[in-house]
Amino acid sequence: MTILEVGSQLIESAVLQMSLTSVLLTASVFTLTLGYFSKLLFTQHSSEHTKYPPHIPSSLPFLGQAVAFGRSPIEFLEKAYEQYGPVVSFTMVGKTFTYLLGSDAAALMFNSKNEDLNAEDVYARLTTPVFGKGVAYDVPNPLFLEQKKMLKTGLNIAQFKQHVEIIEEETKDYFRRWGESGERNLFDALSELIILTASRCLHGCEIRSLLDERVAQLYADLDGGFTHAAWLLPGWLPLPSFRRRDRAHLEIKKIFYNVIKKRREDTEKHDDILQTLIDATYKDGRPLSDDEIAGMLIGLLLAGQHTSSTTSAWMGFFLARDRALQERCYSEQKSVCGEELPPLHYDQLKDLSLLDRCLKETLRLRPPIMTMMRMAKTPQKVGEYTIPPGHQVCVSPTVNHRLQDTWAERLDFDPDRYLHDNPAAGEKFAYIPFGAGRHRCIGENFAYVQIKTIWSTLLRMFDFELVDGHFPPVNYTTMIHTPHNPIIRYTRRNTQPQQ
């Protein structure tokens, strides 16, 4: 083993054991050693006619608020809102972040154009090694929008009607292994199930049939590219997780290339997203290359996997904590679908209104992404303030979803709140788990179908409860805010649904 390999493994081991605060600190030191200390010499001077957002002071040069923010980001932002108002700036690791807190301030981001508030400058270094070149944030925004439109074409109601049957079948097959009762890691189980269901629904039967333990590990290695280290540290570092990510990317693309090649040679047309992409063309008439199709398939799967697995797990723990609510959801299955609980149909999902409200409330209290970011390319006016170019402009769904100004009993899990006055109806950006405006997630409708089908099936199969009253805290060390120590207790229901 070379000195370089030993060194990279030591760095990797350290990063894996770090909190967000520690990673930020390490990134700070690393950045300084690379010569970015010169940023300290840059001072932004306000003209007498320009008012910049209030800036939270720090006694730590360069690091700024990295320690305080990394320790407890939501509480940090809520305190900043109370002290400074809806627009506030602070420095971390030599970069200035400006948060737009609340519905009115958030409108700036969601109504913005990409040439003013740019997404590629923020996300490309994180997504390109995972999805590949030529797709998503690696291409000019107009091209990315064309790619999103192609994917959205394949996410339609006709497809969703087929997906319900597929997802129910996959869920039953997966959870048969759980036996009659026990305690299991709910998040891990749902993460695996989401990959299986999404692969079959979105990639097609050929790719789903290849999803064995080896391919599942490749997906896990690719998914390991979404870390604080990948966001903050240069991608060329020889960290073991970076090398695993890069190897997995190449291996998965090889698998996709073979499937795409066979599809192109097949005279029979299939009805799935893979076929949609094979048949699609850009506005200039150019068809998608195999590499672009493979990259878009990877992006579609992994982007949705995070949202659905995290949200599904949190929803399970909220229902396990409130047993009466869980029983109401189970009773709703019988009242909507039939006392004998026959197989689900797409048209029934919209009538499961209580389950829908439970999902909506889960997304309010535990939106999978804490912060949405853009890079300011031009001066941006918000209220009385001007955000200068170079600031990373951020909106936090988590904060918007629990502001006292908007939400009564803001920390309570109360699905029935949507039966009464719904703040999200009066404030356009008070509820934004999937973004909003031109930045809204294209997979939102599929996520609702997927999660509601999974939980309809699980409620029919099991009764859930917390283990000794333990409700998981939020794990802030990950890019997606997952439940920490997500063990749940379950007992299989005596009533067996019809097959």
From Swiss-Prot:
The keyword Ligase does not apply. Its EC number is 1.14.14.154. The chain crosses the membrane at residues 13-35. It comes from Danio rerio (Zebrafish). Keywords: Cholesterol biosynthesis, Cholesterol metabolism, Endoplasmic reticulum, Heme, Iron, Lipid biosynthesis, Lipid metabolism, Membrane, Metal-binding, Monooxygenase, Oxidoreductase, Steroid biosynthesis, Steroid metabolism, Sterol biosynthesis, Sterol metabolism, Transmembrane, Transmembrane helix. GO terms for molecular function: heme binding; iron ion binding; oxidoreductase activity; sterol 14-demethylase activity. This is Lanosterol 14-alpha demethylase. Inhibited by ketoconazole. May also be inhibited to a lesser extent by propiconazole. Pathway: Steroid biosynthesis; zymosterol biosynthesis; zymosterol from lanosterol: step 1/6. It is an enzyme of class 1 (oxidoreductase). Sterol 14alpha-demethylase that plays a critical role in the cholesterol biosynthesis pathway, being cholesterol the major sterol component in deuterostome membranes as well as a precursor for steroid hormone synthesis. Strongly expressed in intestine. Moderately expressed in liver, with higher levels in females compared to males. Also detected at low levels in brain, eye, kidney and testis. Its cofactor is heme. One of its GO terms (cellular component) is endoplasmic reticulum membrane. It is a single-pass membrane protein. It catalyses: a 14alpha-methyl steroid + 3 reduced [NADPH--hemoprotein reductase] + 3 O2 = a Delta(14) steroid + formate + 3 oxidized [NADPH--hemoprotein reductase] + 4 H2O + 4 H(+); lanosterol + 3 reduced [NADPH--hemoprotein reductase] + 3 O2 = 4,4-dimethyl-5alpha-cholesta-8,14,24-trien-3beta-ol + formate + 3 oxidized [NADPH--hemoprotein reductase] + 4 H2O + 4 H(+); 24,25-dihydrolanosterol + 3 reduced [NADPH--hemoprotein reductase] + 3 O2 = 4,4-dimethyl-8,14-cholestadien-3beta-ol + formate + 3 oxidized [NADPH--hemoprotein reductase] + 4 H2O + 4 H(+); a 14alpha-methyl steroid + reduced [NADPH--hemoprotein reductase] + O2 = a 14alpha-hydroxymethyl steroid + oxidized [NADPH--hemoprotein reductase] + H2O + H(+). GO terms for biological process: cholesterol biosynthetic process via 24,25-dihydrolanosterol; response to yeast. It comes from the Eukaryota. Belongs to the cytochrome P450 family. Heme binds at residue 441. It is found in: Endoplasmic reticulum membrane; Membrane.
